[in-house]
Amino acid sequence: MRIAHVLTSVLILSFCLQTQNLFAQDSVNTSAILDRSAIIRSQRFLDNQDWDWFVENIPFLDCPDEDIQTTYYYRWELITKHLTYGNPDTGYLFTEFIDRPFWSGAYGAISCPAGHQLYEARWLRSGEIAKDYSRYWVNTPGAQPRNYSTWLADAVLAVDAVHPDPEQLGGLLDGLIANYEGWRNRHFDASVGLFWQTGHDDGMEFNIASRQTQDILRGAPSYRPSFNAYMWADAKAIAKIASKQGRVEIEKQFNEFADKLRTTMLAKLWDPKRKFFFPMFKNNENRDGYEISAGTLVYQDGRFAGDNHGRELIGYVPWQFSMFEPKSPYEEAWAKLMDTDGFFADYGPTTVERNDPMFLLQ
């Protein structure tokens, strides 16, 4: 899908979500502008054909681009495939895998996609599901919120922006702080000023850094732009929630920490030569006789030292959370998105540049 189509879909979706309540009637089968029942029934490929559920619960989109429209409703079907119910105390939650593998937490949830799931579920007409899932990660024994990277506090605040619930938001604050401190105690390197994470636990099992180490699946703990962006976003979210609750000292502490984290990330993970954000190795690494020094960015050392590639899509994650002002010098990174020597591909961007020496179809 071309980037223009993607941008168009974002604009249309934004309009749809902002205006759904203006145009919708209470009837399950009709609306003043859109025949919701007819639209959803036209998506005949959906496995879930509980048409009434879609009509009652999701915001509707009608646009002339069939690919965008089909993708939009397919994403809502995925929500239904992974929606489950724990018990009366936990309420609704989402799985990552339908078969609930052994590494999942209570009732099958896994923290890796939790930020995405909360971002999507917040647009349901009722806030019940997204608010239940927010509580799940904070209150449920066995939820395992720190098994994988995620932007939990930021996502919880995003849910509240659509379905305001000051009482619930305030009740989750201490748990969100405890979760953040859990990450900080285990993954923050005060000597560097950044959080470290492995690609595997950052939701990227195959990555350039780990494939240059002895452990290609779980190796190469690094100061990754993705994980540090998540932790910056969570710190800012906790500060905002604390502000809403009148907890001024917590607000101040987390804002100050976020500011320092951002400054350090820009100074250490941005490569002005390659104009992109890269992971920085935490430890000395070696593979096949090639040594990589701790504190170097991907391809600054080792077998491919000096190569002009090494970019991965995680270098764009900081923009998800608006870490920079518009027209910042870091926007040069976006030149690679539509570059055929970079990430451009016919069916969506590749995770590694296509002409990278370590490009791999996996």
Where are these predicted regions, by residue range?
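Catalytic cores of carbohydrate-active enzymes
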Residues: 29, 33-37, 42-46, 50-55, ...
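Bacterial N-terminal signal peptides
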Residues: 8-18
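Acidic/His metal-coordination segments adjacent to aromatic residues that form catalytic metal sites
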Residues: 96-99, 130, 134-142, 201-223, ...
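A generic secondary-structure signal for well-formed alpha-helical elements
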Residues: 79, 83-86, 125-128, 156-163, ...
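Active-site lining segments of carbohydrate-active enzymes
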Residues: 89-112, 116, 173-221, 243-244, ...
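Boundary at the C-terminal end of the N-terminal hydrophobic targeting segment
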Residues: 19-24
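Substrate-binding groove/exosite segments of carbohydrate-active enzymes
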Residues: 40-173, 177, 278-279, 299-323, ...
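Positively charged n-region of N-terminal signal peptides that target proteins for export
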Residues: 1-4
